[in-house]
Amino acid sequence: MIQDVIEKKLSDEFQPEFLKVINESDMHNVPRGSESHFKVTVVSERFAGLRPVARHRLVNQTLADELANHIHALAIHTYTTQEWQQMNQESPESPMCLGGSRKSAQ
């Protein structure tokens, strides 16, 4: 499973205090059982002193093979331990997909 690979790679690379990988493919217009849309939350001191774009680059580099071959969309939420505590240990919810056949009528 792609989700297992993502979890292992992020865990190995960042030794996170907290790691959550959610397959959000069911929120999108893809076949049932797909593994194409993911949300990752990574809490690691490795992000200390880095701007969000630099943190996201590190995650993207870690998952380069999966992004090139399997993952269509990746929502990335990265925090230091202190930032995570300030967020009340919750990452933002992802919006429902409005792409494909799920577009709302206007």
UniProtKB/Swiss-Prot annotation:
Q: Which residues constitute the signal peptide according to the record? A: none
Q: Which InterPro entries match?
A: BolA, BolA-like_sf, BolA/IbaG_stress_morph_reg
Q: One Pfam family this chain carries?
A: BolA
Keyword Ligase assigned to the entry: answer is no
One function term, GO molecular function aspect: DNA binding
Q: What does this protein do?
A: Transcriptional regulator that plays an important role in general stress response.
State the name under which the record lists this protein. DNA-binding transcriptional regulator BolA
Output the lineage of the source organism: Bacteria, Pseudomonadati, Pseudomonadota, Gammaproteobacteria, Vibrionales
